């Protein structure tokens, strides 16, 4: 039976080589597939790929621009901060100088007031001393005259004599105390 089937088909077909009709159909199908891919699919893929490349490159450029702008703003902020710090230091130094000037003015005024109070106190002390000395002279004179009257036994009622005697006596005491 095997022989019959083999003898019935006079063409022998090699299992390694395909039939030429299959090669033609395969080539036509491959050409049609290549045409469809080249005409429709590959351009669409190229557009999508180019859009992604543009988006990535644009994103990188935007990121670089944003980074450059951020660096520029950072430098501006640093410059402003440095300027603000120097202004604050200047203001602080000016305030210290003003405070020292005010302090010196207050001290000078306090010294003047202290000197004025001391001078007024000295004047008051001198005036009170003079008043006390005058009162004591009068009282000492009266006591001395009374004592002298009792010792001498006569009345020293004459006011002018009494005042002259008392003044001479007190002047003698002062000159003796001054030595």
Curated annotation (Swiss-Prot):
Extract the Pfam families matched here.
ATP-synt_B
**Per the UniProt record, which residue ranges are transmembrane?**
23-43
Recorded topology in the membrane: Single-pass membrane protein
Keywords attached to this Swiss-Prot or TrEMBL record, sorted alphabetically, are: ATP synthesis, Cell membrane, CF(0), Hydrogen ion transport, Ion transport, Membrane, Transmembrane, Transmembrane helix, Transport
One Gene Ontology term, aspect cellular component: proton-transporting ATP synthase complex
Record GO terms (molecular function) = proton-transporting ATP synthase activity, rotational mechanism; proton-transporting ATPase activity, rotational mechanism
Record keywords: Translocase included? no
| Functional note | F(1)F(0) ATP synthase produces ATP from ADP in the presence of a proton or sodium gradient. F-type ATPases consist of two structural domains, F(1) containing the extramembraneous catalytic core and F(0) containing the membrane proton channel, linked together by a central stalk and a peripheral stalk. During catalysis, ATP synthesis in the catalytic domain of F(1) is coupled via a rotary mechanism of the central stalk subunits to proton translocation. Component of the F(0) channel, it forms part of the peripheral stalk, linking F(1) to F(0).
Return the protein name.
ATP synthase subunit b
- Which organism's genome codes for this protein? Salinispora arenicola (strain CNS-205)
Q: Which gene encodes it?
A: atpF
């Amino acid at each position: 039976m095997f022989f019959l089937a083999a003898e019935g088909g006079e063409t022998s077909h090699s299992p390694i080589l395909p039939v030429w009709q299959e090669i033609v159909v395969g080539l036509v199908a491959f050409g049609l597939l290549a045409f469809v891919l080249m005409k429709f699919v590959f351009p669409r893929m190229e557009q999508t790929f180019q859009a992604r490349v543009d988006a990535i490159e644009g994103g990188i450029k935007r990121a670089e621009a944003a980074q450059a702008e951020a660096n520029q703003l950072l430098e501006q902020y640093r410059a402003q901060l440095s300027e603000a710090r120097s202004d604050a230091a200047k203001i602080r130094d000016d305030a210290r100088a003003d405070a020292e000037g005010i302090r010196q003015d207050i001290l000078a005024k306090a010294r003047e007031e202290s000197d004025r109070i001391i001078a007024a106190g000295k004047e008051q002390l001198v005036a009170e001393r003079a008043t006390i000395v005058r009162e004591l002279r009068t009282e000492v004179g009266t006591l001395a005259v009374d004592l002298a009257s009792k010792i001498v036994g006569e009345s020293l009622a004459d006011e002018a004599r009494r005042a002259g005697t008392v003044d001479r006596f007190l002047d003698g005491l002062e000159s003796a105390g001054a030595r």
